[in-house]
A protein has these predicted regions:
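N-terminal helix-rich module
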Residues: 2, 14, 26-56, 60, ...
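N-terminal signal-anchor/signal peptide hydrophobic helix marking the start
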Residues: 6-18
């Protein structure tokens, strides 16, 4: 009496491994661009939330609150939110892999007054360092002082 063996042959397993390798090779570039898009989104959200925090703290404290840029090693940027009395409210560490451009270029800080309005209304363009033309977000400060995030370059 003959029994049948069940299982896979070595050739079948090698074909499956080769197909999985090809599919993985096709998925890696799209995953990289997805990670870059998410990196820019995260940076713009962090800036947006820090600007919103500075505005709400200025209203709550009935005094000026300033968001100032900080330059870290390797041209990485972050910022610090401070009250008029010098108290540090929030510190944002270095954001790796993104470039933040402030327009106008000579703006290094934004101060919110007790009314919630900013003394200046700069725009922040956030780019990914590897492909700056594809993944760009713009964070603006409206006349009311509220920050606003837009897809694409600042115009």
């Amino acid at each position: 009496m003959r029994t049948t063996e069940s299982g896979f042959t070595l050739v079948e397993l090698m074909v499956v491994v080769a197909v999985l390798g090809i599919l993985a090779a096709m998925a890696v570039p799209s995953f990289k661009s997805l990670a870059e898009v998410q990196q820019v989104k995260n940076a713009s959200f962090e800036l947006f939330s820090s600007l919103s925090l500075a505005r709400s703290e200025a209203i709550k404290r009935n005094s000026d609150v300033t968001l100032s840029g900080v330059m870290y090693a390797n041209n990485q940027v972050g910022w610090v939110v401070t009250a008029a009395n010098g108290e540090t409210i929030r510190t944002q560490g270095a954001l790796k892999g993104v470039v933040i451009t402030v327009l106008p270029a000579n703006t290094s800080s934004i101060t919110y007054t007790h009314t919630g309005r900013a003394t200046a209304s700069p725009t922040f363009q956030i780019d990914i360092t590897t492909t700056p033309t594809q993944n760009v977000r713009c964070v603006r400060i409206e006349l009311s002082g509220m920050p606003r995030t837009l897809k694409g370059a600042c115009s």
